[in-house]
Regions:
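C-terminal motif of bacterial Sec signal peptides marking the signal peptidase cleavage site
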Residues: 13-17
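Cross-family detector of peptidyl-prolyl cis-trans isomerase
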Residues: 2-8, 18-156
Length: 156
């Protein structure tokens, strides 16, 4: 019996050691892929006139809003829809209060700084400013560029 367990263990070890290592993640190559995908998305959606900010977030202020502007320490109350570039909706929220200094994706922390109370903003977030090379749940794959339409209900 011990002999069979030893042989079985050795066979298992042999197969486990044959597993190939994953290629190292190349952030600059992924950034280039994201940029190409975003440009294709913008070309296919002529109604979107987004600006790329210094941090790499694309944004379009759809409705300016007339209230206070967000700051890095603001709490922003929003309604939002999140989609992948292919249009697949992965999330939606109403009346969500988000503190920009908390643990949220960088794309929101940076992109919502372009928003004011009462406004609507479109954010196109490269993967590095979203979930990076890790999937999030079942609906957001690794290296996904995310598109958000966000209504700003209040800023405090």
């Amino acid at each position: 019996m011990k002999k069979h367990l030893l042989i079985l263990s050795l066979v298992f070890l042999a197969f486990a050691s044959c597993k190939k290592d994953e290629a190292p993640f190349d952030a600059s190559a992924q950034a280039a892929k994201d940029e190409t995908a975003i440009q294709a998305y913008l070309s296919a959606h002529a109604d979107i006139n987004a600006t790329k900010d210094a941090n790499g977030v694309y944004y379009q202020v759809i409705t300016e809003g007339n209230g206070a502007a967000a700051t890095a320490t603001s709490t922003v109350t929003v309604n939002y829809i999140g989609k992948l570039l292919d249009g697949t909706q992965f999330d939606t929220g109403t009346g969500l209060a988000v503190k920009l200094s908390d643990n949220i994706i960088k794309g929101w922390k940076l992109g919502l700084l372009h928003a004011k109370t009462g406004g609507r903003i479109l954010l196109i977030v490269p993967s590095a400013l979203a979930y990076g090379n890790k999937a999030s749940g079942l609906k957001i794959p690794a290296n996904a560029v995310l598109v958000f339409t966000i209504d700003i209900l209040g800023i405090s």
